[in-house]
Amino acid sequence: MKEKEKIIVAMSGGVDSAVAAGLLMEAGYDVIGVNLRTWEYEAPACDTTKKSCCSPEDIRDARDVGLSLNIPFYVIKMEKVFGERVIDRFISDYKDGRTPNPCVECNTFVKFGALFEQAKKLGIDKIATGHYARVIEVDGRYAIRNAVDMKKNQTYYLYGLSQDNIKNTVFPLGEMDKSEVREIAKRMGLPVAEKPESQEICFIPENDYRSFLKKKGMEFTPGFFKLASGQIIGKHQGKEGFTIGQRKGLGIAWKNPLYVLSIEDDGTVVLGEEEETVSESFVLEEITYQALAPLALGQSMEMKVQIRYRSAPVHCKVTSLGETWKVNFLEDVKSVTPGQSATFYPTNGDYLFAGGIIQKGSITRKIKSNVEVQRESVPI
């Protein structure tokens, strides 16, 4: 009798990874379930009424799924790599005026990078997750392809995977929509069939990142609000509490809504009206290539770019500067944010060419200043 192929399934305690494990069992794999313990949780973060992920409650749910499926289940301690790769960068990015994307870092270095290292120690080549994505091979290179359910599509968070990791990853849910996954969970009798989806950053209770940063000892840098023209219009208590494109919570009275245009090292937060948020270009750094082979210095190419998870890709032209790209938009795009990820796709394709980080200080805007100063409204 042929021995079943072993596969490790990363089980978060949610319905998606539970169904992924069940489907692989039905497909004939020898499934081993693992949960990655990434964070030492304080009591408030363990409130089971909150829709977070990776909490002690989620570990219990993942273990219950393992019992229900009758598969081996293990908890792997990942606090060290998670702290170094995800939390440390999260803190340093905010301190430096960038807006981080911890889920990208976690996928790249923990859920796939570190987990593959553990799998290889056990002599296991393949892992699977409950991500909504697919794998495609293009001209001898591997890439993440959009899921069928575009409302759940997660390719944006997976651009950092290496060629070897993509090749050896299975995404059982890539061809399904969420409602179908729920029905399969009910058919399988899984205890998490009706569990709500996670909606928070796992280590940020209540999504209050400012309180988290303060607990980590970060000192906020107070400074001035000013317009792109240079006119000072107010004060704030810390640049670390703002992000590019932010409109709410500024505390500035103005005839039209103001948005954060940039955050300067000296603590200055530059504001402008909505039309001033439109960007012309930016520089991409920390590039990971997937279907696209590395571009030669000076080589240009038109493609599509996505600058945030919920936004639609837009047309752009990229030019290789060596280790970075110059990205010029061919359509209007608002509030390009340094520190966030940008993913790239063929103009007529549904798979990843490449991805990287939007470089701080590299963003050019179409309109430099369009706000008339209202001296009577300046709360200094």
UniProtKB/Swiss-Prot annotation:
Its EC number is 2.8.1.13. The record marks H131, Q340 as: Interaction with tRNA. Residues 152-154, 308-309 are annotated as: Interaction with tRNA. Pfam families: tRNA_Me_trans, tRNA_Me_trans_C, tRNA_Me_trans_M. Keywords: ATP-binding, Cytoplasm, Disulfide bond, Nucleotide-binding, RNA-binding, Transferase, tRNA processing, tRNA-binding. The active site is at C106, C202. GO terms for cellular component: cytoplasm. NCBIfam families: PRK00143.1, trmU. Belongs to the MnmA/TRMU family. This is tRNA-specific 2-thiouridylase MnmA. It comes from Leptospira biflexa serovar Patoc (strain Patoc 1 / ATCC 23582 / Paris). The gene is mnmA.
